[in-house]
Amino acid sequence: MESTLTLTLCECSENHVGMEKNGEKSKTGFNKDIIDKLVNAYNDKKIERIDLTKYLNNSEYNEYAELLIIRNAIENHEIIYNELINLDWDKKYYCLRRKKVLNKLARSNLCFDNYNQNPDYENKKGRIVCYENIPNFNKEKNKICNILNEDLKCEGNKYEDIFKQGIGWHGDSERLKVIGCRFGKPMSLYFNWFKNCNPIGEMFKTFINSGDIYVMSEKVTGNDWKKKSLYTLRHSAGCEKYTKLNIKENKKPLCIEDLSSRIDTLE
């Protein structure tokens, strides 16, 4: 398995920022009761529950922010990897800033649903693959959806070279529900708190292996990351180019306006 694949179950998927959205953003994300339900459903697996508030170093902050990792939750992960790897992944996207179709460099993407759709990048439409074409993954998706009693969408990221590719620091503005399923090579996953555009507290780092599932509570998704005055979480993954935090004296804070000019590398 040469590449790293992450398939994200969520209420709203997209092939790239600014491209067509599939589904609608939920009003609420995953709370502790839902996290507990998943823990109980996978009680025969190794469970890691990370309270990310401990990395803020602020004892007065008490908003629920838990990352759940279920190790080797998907036992037939190699079969699913082979099912996914040879699909035609999107390597192009429509850039809103430059108003034209560009090549994807940091990763490739693909959305999944109950139908097939050919890409039309000029009109901001990415490729969609029908679940019937990936029956082994579909079984795992349905298992999770049945546990939660939800009909979730699916969005995939493909990293062909984890030493050169990744995704920069960001929050998931388009959704409140995130369940990541990893296939292929292990890859890093980082979280850090921010306030007023500045990183604060301690960075949390882990590796997500093939067959692992990770689940973000609502706060952990970073859906509120554009609200500068709040304590918010951002995450990143991949090589150092995308995961390094440049914290230097007198350096201009990493604000949303700065990030928007580099959206090509972030998303």
Ranges and model annotations:
Residues 1-267:
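Non-heme Fe(II) oxygenase metal-center motifs and adjacent flexible, charged/small-residue loops
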